[in-house]
Amino acid sequence: SQTKMPFALDWKFEGPSAPYFYAIDNGYFKSEGLEVEISAGKGSLDAIPKVATGAFPVGFADINSLVKFLDKNPSAPVIAVMMVYDKPPFAIAGRKSLGITSPKDLEGKTLGAPPPDGAWAQFTPFAKANNLNVEKIKVEPVGFPTREPMLAEKKVDAITGFSFSMFLNLVRLGVP
């Protein structure tokens, strides 16, 4: 009999989750006695507690978010067992037409950032490494579903997110 194995993703079904679906479709998990069911998530800060509470035995999440979670919850029964990205896909996307061509250009502009976003969580060290005056950057808390549309509609000058997700969403919205 197959062992049920719920798997919590950090995000929607996008490119990075393809290997897991490939393994399901080609019977790799089944041949190991596993019945894997993949659930979409709402960010790493959604996936990690699902595993820590036992709601899911395994999940996919950003290592930086896990470190932050474990700092606040040192006795949580959750560990990292594998690295997927060789470097994080954190990015800030801005529009040339709005004057964003370098990190310093964020000063005097509005940055749209979802509060639970992994890229936003790394903004402070990014700003420090790039000598940014964060007091000159207006940060607009935005939702994940509205992030790219707000940039497309020029309601914000730049956004935080994962490079591959933002790129595809912005192309879909017709942003050059």
Residue ranges and their predicted role:
Residues S1-E153, D157-F164:
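Short, glycine-/small- and polar/acidic-enriched structural segments
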Residues V156, V171-L173:
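Extended amphipathic alpha-helical interaction segments
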Residues S165-M166, L173-P176:
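Short, intrinsically disordered, charge-balanced linker/junction segments flanking boundaries
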